[in-house]
């Protein structure tokens, strides 16, 4: 027999245990078309429940967020029809919901035409030149018409205006007063034309190509005029420089002639020859001045004249080397080498003077002095090279390692620890490729071998000196005295080429004097003095480990500086010991106070910026969690807050608390120790009141939550110590490093039962334990070890 009703309806045919879905269908009479799903809520009007539907009656906090809460959910317009009309008309015009590529683009013609003449006019007024008026007139006369006929007419007008302006410029150069009046009139006319053209051009379009052609034409013509003016100024300047140079050379030549006449009468003929050379130079200079008048060949003539002048200057220097009595200077312009002679020396002391007659010409003097001059020039050039490498090179050339080419060689392959100077310098090198062995040791190598190896493996030849200085760490080329000695060794004494024997004797005498000084200086040190010997003996007597090797010494009693409180273990004066102890206590006290003040300051700053990581460094209470939620709810400037990392139950508690305040939680950070929760406000936060019943239920749960991203404070572990028996303080006994366990324990009394038992068995004081006294007489010593230095 089938059942009357199923499980869902619970007897839909009129059973008393359950109602039917269409219960109202049978009861309704009259209007049967009405939907059976209608309820009492639809029948009743909303006017009966105005208090529930009015959003203004809900409590919302004051401020900006309160205003947002009131307006939330309301329509933009008062009626639905107005809102529908608004959305229908702005369906395709609301660009906020469309992408950029779907938005239409409209091109609107500008009301005013862009005219670049305004900018050009301002620039010409700022940088006014003698051609400024011409530029103004030319740019103002530019037309912006599209038709070709108008552009051609404008070009003709511009050419006529240019001719008129050139005539005006010629008149202005002749008479200044007339130019001023003309400029004023031109300015007035140009301003009128400028205003007229602006009014006409504002209504017309302009052609860029025509404007560009006209501007290029005018700028090229103006550039030609400026170049011509610069060429004229350069020619005048060069003529002035040449005249000044001739005056200086004539003054120098006059001073040289006067010095020769005052020194001796033997150089009269030489002075005449020199005056002839000077006259030739003056003639050559006059010819140069005539050549300079031609503009086309100006550069070539100036180069030839400079070459001739340099050759004549060199000849003059060679002549001065042989015949100047006051001083002999070699290449004095480069400051290379100079040697002074006294005024009273005779002519025979000058090199090359024996072979020269007073009546000889200048050519004979220069020919006979060539060998000596070559030697001098070679010597001076070598010295100049060394001076440049020693002085100028460090300033201009960077150290090794600052250029890209320096990294072609691996510097770690070679290591130099010492250098030996001699006939052939040697380096104490450690290099596997150079030695050919894998042994990590140093070997002596000649400098030539090291240089060959280095150059073959990537070091540039011009960077070799810097490389050696870098590898030897300043052992080579670091002293200026050595470089000066090398320069002195290569210098050649030109005056004493024939006096070799005398120079050798002088050198021997100097060496003997140096040896005597060195020998006498050796005896100054008191070898037999006993200064400090008594202190050394006293130290060896008092020191317990003075003669013990470092590996065998016992450092177990050394107290670290952090844990030191006294200086009793030091053998120092008691007054000094008390002073050090007092200073140490003050230092530790001040350090603790500073640390405490710094932590308090950090906590205050964290409270101001609501940083929970500093406010709650170890744990957070459930009361503090609720206080943070209340502060966030009342603070209108904040919209979110982040809690420290807690365990899973703590995160679940925070999530439940956020639901009570109608807020959301987000998981942030990495999974694990870095995982934390971020609580944020929502729209519902300002619509509804917090569920304080559920909040109170959560408050009755777990009271404390520890942070899992921080280790527990070790001080808390120390406080949880088991109290020792018989100790009033309740703490354990503390031992120091190296203390003997039970060293201060008293001897076992005879009343002890264990001792009485041993005595009855035949044991007496001083005997060993075990069968026939085979055991040890003294107990094994046990030392306390707190450090991690190993077993001693």
Curated annotation (Swiss-Prot):
One GO MF term: nucleic acid binding
Ranges of biased composition (kind: Polar residues): 36-47, 265-274
Where does the R3H domain lie?
A: 619-683
**What top-level branch of life does the organism fall under?**
Eukaryota
Q: Which residues form the G-patch domain?
A: 750-792
Skewed-composition ranges (Acidic residues)? 145-209, 277-316, 496-515
Sorted keywords for this record are: Cytoplasm, mRNA processing, mRNA splicing, Nucleus
Tell me where in or outside the cell this protein is found.
Cytoplasm; Nucleus
Q: Where is the composition biased (Basic and acidic residues)?
A: 234-248
Q: Cytoplasm among the record's keywords?
A: yes
Task: Return the GO cellular component terms, semicolon-separated.
Answer: cytoplasm; nucleus
* GO terms, biological process: mRNA processing; RNA splicing
Question: SMART domains given for it?
Answer: G_patch (SM00443)
The answer to whether the entry has keyword Cytoplasm is: yes
Q: What InterPro entries does this protein map onto?
A: G_patch_dom, R3H_G-patch, Splicing_assoc_domain
User: Biased composition, Basic residues: where in the chain?
Assistant: 1-11, 24-35
Q: Where is this region: Disordered?
A: 1-47, 139-209, 225-327, 343-364, 494-530, 709-734
**Family listed:** Belongs to the SQS1 family.
Q: What does this protein do?
A: May be involved in splicing.
Name of the protein in its database record:
Protein SQS1
Q: Which organism is it from?
A: Lodderomyces elongisporus (strain ATCC 11503 / CBS 2605 / JCM 1781 / NBRC 1676 / NRRL YB-4239)
Q: Which gene encodes it?
A: SQS1
């Amino acid at each position: 027999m089938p059942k009357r009703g199923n499980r869902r309806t619970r007897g839909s045919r009129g059973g008393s245990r359950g109602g039917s879905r269409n219960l109202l269908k049978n009861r309704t009479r009259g209007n049967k078309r009405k939907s059976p799903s209608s309820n009492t809520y639809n029948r009743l009007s909303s006017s009966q429940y105005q208090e529930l539907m009015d959003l203004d009656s809900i409590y919302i906090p004051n401020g900006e967020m309160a205003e947002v809460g009131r307006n939330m959910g309301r329509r933009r317009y008062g009626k639905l029809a107005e809102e529908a009309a608004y959305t229908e008309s702005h369906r395709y015009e609301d660009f906020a919901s469309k992408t950029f590529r779907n938005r239409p683009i409209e091109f609107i013609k500008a009301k005013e035409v862009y005219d670049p003449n305004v900018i050009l006019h301002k620039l010409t007024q700022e940088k006014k030149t003698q051609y400024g008026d011409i530029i103004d007139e030319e740019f103002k006369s530019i037309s912006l018409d599209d038709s070709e006929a108008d552009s051609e007419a404008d070009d003709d007008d511009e050419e006529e205006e240019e001719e008129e302006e050139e005539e005006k410029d010629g008149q202005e150069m002749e008479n200044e007063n007339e130019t001023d009046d003309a400029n004023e009139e031109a300015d007035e006319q140009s301003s009128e034309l400028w205003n007229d053209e602006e009014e006409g051009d504002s209504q017309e379009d302009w052609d860029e190509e025509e404007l560009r052609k006209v501007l290029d034409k005018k700028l090229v013509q103006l550039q030609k005029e400026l170049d011509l003016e610069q060429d004229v100024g350069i020619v005048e300047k060069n003529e002035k420089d040449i005249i000044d140079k001739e005056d200086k050379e004539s003054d120098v030549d006059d001073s040289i002639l006067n010095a020769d006449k005052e020194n001796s009468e033997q150089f009269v003929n030489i002075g005449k020859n020199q005056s002839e050379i000077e006259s030739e130079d003056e003639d050559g200079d006059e010819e140069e001045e005539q050549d300079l008048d031609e503009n086309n060949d100006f550069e070539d003539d100036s180069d030839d004249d400079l070459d001739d002048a340099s050759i004549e200057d060199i000849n003059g220097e060679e002549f001065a080397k042989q015949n100047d009595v006051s001083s002999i200077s070699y290449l004095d312009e480069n400051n290379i080498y100079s040697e002074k002679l006294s005024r009273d020396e005779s002519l025979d002391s000058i090199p090359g003077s024996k072979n020269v007659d007073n009546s000889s010409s200048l050519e004979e003097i220069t020919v006979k002095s060539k060998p000596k001059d070559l030697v001098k020039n070679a010597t001076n050039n070598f010295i100049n090279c060394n001076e440049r490498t020693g002085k100028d090179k460090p300033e201009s050339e960077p150290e090794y390692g600052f250029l890209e080419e320096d990294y072609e060689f691996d510097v770690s392959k070679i290591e130099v620890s010492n250098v030996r100077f001699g006939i052939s310098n040697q380096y104490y090198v450690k290099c596997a490729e150079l030695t050919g062995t894998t042994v990590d040791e140093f070997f002596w190598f000649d400098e030539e071998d090291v240089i060959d190896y280095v150059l073959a493996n990537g070091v540039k030849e011009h960077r070799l000196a810097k490389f050696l200085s870098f590898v030897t760490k300043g052992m080579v080329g670091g002293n200026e005295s050595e470089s000066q000695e090398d320069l002195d060794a290569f210098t050649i004494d030109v005056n004493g080429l024939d006096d070799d024997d005398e120079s050798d004797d002088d050198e021997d005498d100097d060496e003997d004097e140096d040896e005597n000084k060195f020998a006498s200086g050796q005896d100054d040190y008191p070898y037999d003095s006993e200064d400090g010997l008594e202190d050394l003996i006293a130290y060896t007597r008092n020191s317990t480990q003075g003669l013990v090797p470092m590996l065998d010494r016992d450092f177990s009693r050394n107290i670290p500086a952090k844990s030191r409180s006294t200086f009793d273990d030091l053998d120092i004066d008691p007054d000094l010991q008390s002073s050090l102890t007092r200073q140490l206590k003050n230092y530790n006290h001040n350090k603790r106070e500073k640390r405490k003040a710094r932590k308090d300051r950090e906590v205050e700053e964290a409270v101001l910026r609501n940083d929970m990581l500093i406010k709650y460094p170890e744990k957070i209470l459930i009361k503090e969690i609720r206080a943070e939620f209340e502060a966030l709810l009342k603070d209108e400037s904040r919209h979110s807050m982040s809690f420290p990392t807690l365990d899973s139950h703590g995160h679940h508690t925070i999530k439940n608390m956020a639901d009570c305040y109608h807020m959301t939680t987000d998981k942030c950070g990495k999974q694990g120790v870095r995982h934390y929760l971020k609580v944020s406000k929502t729209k519902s936060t300002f619509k509804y009141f917090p569920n304080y019943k559920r909040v109170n239920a959560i408050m009755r749960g777990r009271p404390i939550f520890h942070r899992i991203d921080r280790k527990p404070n070790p001080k808390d572990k120390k406080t949880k110590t088991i109290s020792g028996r018989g100790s009033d303080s309740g703490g354990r006994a503390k031992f120091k490093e190296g203390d003997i366990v039970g060293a201060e324990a008293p001897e076992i009394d005879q009343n002890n039962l264990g001792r009485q038992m041993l005595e009855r068995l035949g044991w007496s004081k001083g005997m060993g334990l075990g069968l026939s006294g085979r055991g040890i007489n003294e107990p094994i010593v046990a030392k306390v070890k707190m450090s991690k230095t190993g077993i001693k």
